[in-house]
Amino acid sequence: MNTTTSEMNPANILLVKAHSMGIGDLLRSSAAWSALKARWPDTRLHLLMLSKQSGYATEAFIRSHHLLASAHFVTVKTGDPGQDRQPSRPRAQVWAEVAQRLKDQPIDLIIDCESGGMRTALLTWWLGRIKRAQRVGIAQFPMRRLCYDLVAPSGPRYAARLGLPLPIDYTERDFVALAALGIARNGTRITLKSAAAGQAWRNDHPLLAGAGQSIVVLNIGCGTEDAIPKRPELPKLVACLVALYAQQPFALHLSGAEFEREVNQAFRGLLSTAMAQHGWQAEVLDWAGQLSLDELTGLLGQADLVVSSDSGPYHMAVALGVPTLCWFNFDTPPSYHPQRGVVALVLPGPDQFVASALGLLTAGCQT
């Protein structure tokens, strides 16, 4: 196909991804979705995600994203998530399922957002043939460029061209493929709006605070075994929040999954003891395990400040435009959101934490 980017006006774009089903990993693609909608306001965006297993909570959450017309999740592995080895499904079986999911969906442009391997490259090439669609992808190595009609430079070349450090910021990664279309990020933020469930929860559960108090949502998170190293040490976190309360009293709401309820309760006990030493008693409500991801947007969206570890609710709060302070246990530049209304701190002490939190509270919402 010889259509140039200036002549393009695709009615339906398919975005192919196969990296991770984590909340933050998928939500950070929303900046690229925004950029595509800015270029072609009337285009309909469709996500095709090749995931390792089915049933992730993020499936329903991403399907409800306001920038997507549809989202399709196709598993590429067999067996249970806990197995040491999970065999891959035969390629023909995966492709047949993809074709079935998309059989009634017109597609004009297919963008392979992945840079590694050949799985998504070959699938994009094949889908382009059966849908008679333009194909866009990343020439991470020479063989991949043969699968596309329009080719973006490799990730390292893209980074060098823009003077970006490696590894590339996670939000920036989808823009590597978009470079083939002449679409640049230009500071585009990730974005999220509460879907119907989130709006309903917010209407049914208005968060209240006393006179002169702020509403703070704390997500300690990192409850899975692989994420525990990212969880803040509870005594240090308590010390920072007590120091903040001394400067700006707040009502505190704890978020988290059901399996994070135990750590929330441990934190709550430590905080209560520390506050009592000053004669204070903060209101603390624990919502762990009680909210869907869509309902969680109704909680986060009411906060004056969200404090979170490096986990999904951190990216959700940023995307909602809520002032957000993220606590990192180690320097992780690809996970930062270098923009107004967001502060990333690495092992902060009370003084640094309080100064950053007060700055965010003063600046207010970024939507």
Where are these regions (language model features)?
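Catalytic machinery of carbohydrate-active enzymes
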Residues: 1-367
